Each structure stands twice: as structure tokens, then as C-alpha cells.
Design a protein with these regions (language model features):
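A short helix->loop->beta-strand "cap" motif at the edges of active sites that frequently abuts
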Residues: 18-22, 104
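Generic beta-sheet signal
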Residues: 25-27, 62
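Short, catalytically relevant binding-site loops at active-site mouths
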Residues: 1, 29-33, 66-67, 114
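Short, mixed-charge, low-aromatic patches
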Residues: 1-5, 86
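A generic local secondary-structure boundary/capping motif
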Residues: 11-14, 49
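Charged helix-capping and loop-helix junction motifs
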Residues: 4-12, 38-43
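C-terminal functional extensions of proteins
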Residues: 37-137
Length: 137
């Protein structure tokens, strides 16, 4: 969990005073005990709680597929994760807009890759690099 990295003394203060871009790359798949049914707004609320800051991140990078779209495109992978009580974390335009209206920039992009063995979802490093280059310039 990334939350434990935010708990040491001084991290919240550093986040508040830093002028750096603070970027959150969301999970691709829910974790039953951590991010099950998380929305972008829920991410923001949890990060606010543990950092005690209004804007613990100002950019959110997430997949460009909603959960429904993913399940239609990759039904065999969705079923495999469902057997583990997990699901793809992709969101609707309305769910993303809810966070955007709070001042968080949304970068919804093709950032996933599927492993050839076992059909597992991973953040694709090359795809993420393109998104980071776009953000950072």
C-alpha cells in the first residue's frame, strides 16, 4: 500500500509546501482488503485523510476504460479476477468528472498491458512513460 509511505512525520508538511506536481497512478485491479470498489473520489478522500492536505495529488493517471468496457472487451480476464473477488478499476466519465471538479487533473490513458502468461493486468512501463512525458514536458 502506498498509504504507509505517507505516514512518516513531515510527509504531510512536505506535500503542502511542495510546488512539484503530485501524481497518483491508480491501481488497475481492486484489492479486496484495500481498494475494492474504489472510485477516484474515494482515492482522494483516503489520501486526504492520511496526508491531512486538500490536494495530496493534483494529477490522477488511470486507465481509459470503464469497468464495464473492460469486462466487455476482456471477459475472460474479468472472470478470472472475479474468482479472486477482484475487478478492474476503470471508471465512467461521471466518476472521473467528480474528481476533476475538485481541481484534480485526470489523465485517462491506455496504460495497461496483459501478461501472456495467466492473463494478468500490469501497468505498461512504455505506455506510462508516454503519459509522464506528456505531463512533465
Amino acid at each position: 500500500s502506498v498509504i504507509s509511505n505517507l505516514l512518516p512525520i513531515g510527509i504531510s508538511d512536505a506535500l503542502m509546501v511542495s510546488s512539484a506536481q503530485k501524481i497518483l497512478v491508480t491501481n488497475l485491479v481492486s484489492n479486496r482488503n484495500q481498494t475494492h470498489h474504489f472510485t477516484p473520489d474515494r482515492y482522494l478522500k483516503v489520501f486526504r485523510k492520511y496526508t491531512h492536505t486538500e490536494f495530496p495529488f493534483n494529477i490522477l493517471i488511470c486507465p481509459n476504460l470503464s469497468q464495464n468496457s473492460f469486462e466487455k472487451r476482456y471477459p475472460h480476464i474479468a472472470k478470472s479476477y472475479a474468482l479472486e473477488h477482484a475487478h478492474f478499476l476503470g471508471w465512467t466519465v461521471n466518476e472521473l468528472d467528480a474528481v476533476s471538479r475538485k481541481g484534480i487533473k485526470i489523465e485517462s490513458s491506455d496504460i495497461i498491458s496483459i501478461t501472456p502468461h495467466l492473463n494478468r493486468l500490469r501497468h505498461d512501463p512504455q505506455k506510462l512513460a508516454r503519459v509522464f512525458k506528456k505531463i512533465i514536458g
